[in-house]
Amino acid sequence: MVNEIKQAIANILHELFPNAEIYDEDVPQGFKTPSFLIIVVESSYKKAIDEKYNASVSFDLAYFPEREYESKNECYEVSQNILRAFDVLNSYKVTNKTSSITDNVLHVKFTVKYREIKTSQFEKMRDIIFN
């Protein structure tokens, strides 16, 4: 499920910022800018009723701006676009959206909540022969 959500994040980022590189969990040496780094910060998975589960995954999107000398203005603009676009990811609700700039890197943090229903695997009935 987490990989599905990460892919949805990457798809939206690619639509909003087609020229930006998108990295997953790790930035390679000599990475290109502008770029995004998608990081899973925390996840929880709690049993609700019967076979139902409530889950949440918290993300940190780090944005490395292209222009070093105007990085804060670029970060403000990118932050605004992301916060507006990230309300729902593939029908998953996005909550707790915040953004901050640290050392000229934008961090947009949010949580994705979803529910799962586990289905039990039973052996199928065989044919019944009546006489």
Stretches with model-predicted labels:
Residues Y69-L89:
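Short, hydrophobic/π-rich interface segment
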Residues M1-S44:
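Small/polar-rich, solvent-exposed N-terminal microdomains that initiate assembly or binding
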Residues M1-N3, Y45-I49, N54, T95-N131:
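Short, charged interaction patches at domain edges and termini
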